[in-house]
Amino acid sequence: MADLSLLQEDLPEDADGLGVDDYSSESDVIIIPSALDFVSQDEMLTPLGRLDKYAASENVFNRQMVARSLLDTLREVCGEERDCIAVLERISRLADDSEPTVRAELMEQVPHIALFCQENRPSIPYAFSKYLLPIVVRYLADQNNQVRKTSQAALLALLEQELIERLDVETKVCPVLIDLTAPDSNDDVKTEAVAIMCKMAPMVGKDITERLILPRFCEMCCDCRMFHVRKVCAANFGDICSVVGQQATEEMLLPRFFQLCSDNVWGVRKACAECFMAVSCATCQEIRRTKLSALFINLISDPSRWVRQAAFQSLGPFISTFANPSSSGQCFKDESKSSEDKDRIRDDGVVQEEQSRPEDAPSDLSAPHSSARLDGTLEGCAAETPGDSAGDMRVPADSSLLCTLSSESPQEAASDAESGKKHDNNSKSASRPDVGTSSPEPTPLDQEMFNSFHFWRTPLPQIDLDKELQQDPGERPSPERTGDAPAAPVPGSPSITMATRKELEEMIENLEPHMDDPDVKAQVEVLSAALRASTLDAHDEAGGAEQRSELQDDAVGAGGELPNCSISEDTSEPLVIAAEENMEATPDYIHGGADVGPGGGGGFSPDEERRPKVQDVVPQALLDQYLSMTDPSRAQTVDTEIAKHCAYSLPGVALTLGRQNWHCLRETYETLASDMQWKVRRTLAFSIHELAVILGDQLTAADLVPIFNGFLKDLDEVRIGVLKHLHDFLKLLHIDKRREYLYQLQEFLVTDNSRNWRFRAELAEQLILLLELYSPRDVYDYLRPIALNLCADKVSSVRWISYKLVSEMVKKLHMATPPTFGVELINELVENFGRCPKWSGRQAFVFVCQTVIEDDCLPMDQFAVHLMPHLLTLANDRVPNVRVLLAKTLRQTLLEKEYFLASASCHQEAVEQTIMALQMDRDSDVKYFASIHPSSTKLSEDAMSTASSTY
């Protein structure tokens, strides 16, 4: 009850009969009484007595202090259940206080009191549910705004800490919130209640949300009288969708969302645009593609600039919801490891790790899914001669329908792959003569149709091979019987093209009423062009289908058989194929299959460069709008920061499209990289390493390296983005390309502002990581001078990181064979720092030795030979700071090593003699640190204080 000492007594000024004029008549000495001379009446009261006294006070301040000290009172009486219940009952009476400030103060203490009751549940069972929760719920409808806000915050805090029982949520909380959102409820209270319902939905779970919250939420979305209510519903729409799941979202929420997106109030439409990504994540691919895309196009073309601004900011995140591991070539599972890093499974069922050079293929970036091997493939279906390039993925024309395509989850695909391989091993000899009629050498036409680019250009049908593999040769149908089966539609067929054209026509029709807006007019032009392109694509696909049909007829006529394959259409998700090479020797995996052409080289041919920016992963209209975000006119009509938003979401869009569609984004990325605003370039610089992982080494070397080089020469605000992820980017490059940057690392020491020491500190951090990427000679020739320069930096934080860098460098060079560079580095440390004329250099030498000992960068016998003699000579240094640090290092670090504790060598004797000399030093601090036991203090704290005190 410490706070009660501040309480004001409601007593007359002369009640105690004492005043400053009192004095002793005998001695005529004036006595001024002190408050410590009297026993306060409060000290004579019990905690409950003090609580009752001040809770009934007419002074508002006293009642506020009572509310603030309730938790302390509970702690004092927690040993007695009866007293705890008495305090809780007085809380209920205090909740009826007429002063809003008292009620608000009480509500601020409720979460703390509830937590105390939960921790002491055996003493006061059901205390919260019976005494506190009714107060919280009642205050949700309080007339005072401050009390309502405080109770709402308290309710959310209680739900977040799971202090409210599930039954109480259903029977006490939700009914009150539903009543507060009734049509006849107060407008302000209704709006706040809807917001509370939306925020508590993720905390109470799917079941309660669907049964109790969702019906009323749908009603509030259609509240015609209060646009504030609709705006709150729109702003929290994504949270509700993520809680209730896909089915409830599509059946109940989507119709309301469409209404909100066309609301008369622009604030409601803007809120819809801001939560569009969350809504999209809760729907299936088909609805996302057919309905939400058209709805989003309407928001992008909205008459209100604020709505368009919010829509463009959400465009990149919305496009990212179309991402599929099979189309992107990347799939990240647990432990943050890419599925591409998993072990490869050979035909014989033996798991082997992918062989790759460390400098060419870093551990966290390997070949994409497009370069994986086909699950359960047949040798006659995808034969390849040893002379073929690893970059070729050749599939004969007459067997193009024999490839197993997968649009399932990566986990399912992995399990199917194992079972498929086992089945393939058992049936390979039986199936080989019946399936394959293709020759080992593909024809030039095959190479043109099924090179890596055309292979990814259009999705292929999904085919089930199990039926054909499980049938005996005698049971397989004849070509005539196979031809009688009805043909299933494939992607790119006229029926699918008709659906696309119909979708485009509907979009154009919806936008025509807003043709006065230049943005809407531009959008109509884009959609019209897409409509014309879809018409042309329909003719091209029809011609290609006829050509494939002729090739298959020729194969059948030559004596081949087409197996009985059930073809199923799956246009809702991008497809991926994994091709397995059947070479008897060690398999050469297709590296970056989406990046390499028929000749195995990287990059794209001139014909591919000129191809239109068309893809099939996301609706083309969305991609066109995203690409238009770099248009200068957008900055004037939408948002001056629109280019920055485009740059921020570009890695997500690139991951969604996959590296096979990088040609759609290349020009946009180059435009952003040369943007006049440094914030745009800075955003790209911070994410270029992520984009390099997505694109693979071939495209990175061709398209990202030039931009990366430009960022290295940019402003410091841009360069810091490159520097923070320098190791992450360089490890993705080929060793030869990586070595080119050794000459540019020195430039990071030069900054626009010499006081920007954090830049140099980050450089030291990155150099520690870069040690593993370069050879010992490169480390010695290029990284060593930078490290020694940083060790002499003016700022202690930079020097501390640099000591770690030098010690790691000593470790790497000493482990090299032969350790010549390591010895030379140690000699340079001794010469430049151990014998430095400046005492700060000699102190740095001690710090480096200390770090080498702590991190075991050198074997102790080698340390005793190369560094310790020079270290011990500093015992006679004329500067006390150096001797203090030496005493700490010897006593607290060196003597803790087993080598110096167990061996009775001359090195141990030299250390003991040095410590004895330091214990007799004329400086008291040196004596202290040379005498104390190693475990009695922390070296890092003392050393840091020594370092900081010297500058």
From Swiss-Prot:
What InterPro entries does its record include?
A: ARM-like, ARM-type_fold, HEAT, HEAT_type_2, PP2A_Regulatory_Subunit_A
Coiled coil region boundaries = none
Tell me the residues on which Phosphoserine occurs: 936
Q: Which UniProt keywords apply?
A: Phosphoprotein, Repeat
* Any one annotated GO CC term: cytoplasm
Instruction: Give the Basic and acidic residues compositional bias ranges.
Output: 332-360, 464-483, 539-551
Bias (Gly residues) occurs at 594-604
Q: Could you tell me what this protein does?
A: Regulatory subunit of serine/threonine-protein phosphatase 4. May play a role in regulation of cell division in renal glomeruli. The PPP4C-PPP4R1 PP4 complex may play a role in dephosphorylation and regulation of HDAC3. Plays a role in the inhibition of TNF-induced NF-kappa-B activation by regulating the dephosphorylation of TRAF2.
Can you state the subunit structure given in the record?
Serine/threonine-protein phosphatase 4 (PP4) occurs in different assemblies of the catalytic and one or more regulatory subunits. Component of the PP4 complex PPP4C-PPP4R1. Interacts with HDAC3.
Full protein name: Serine/threonine-protein phosphatase 4 regulatory subunit 1
Organism listed in the record:
Rattus norvegicus
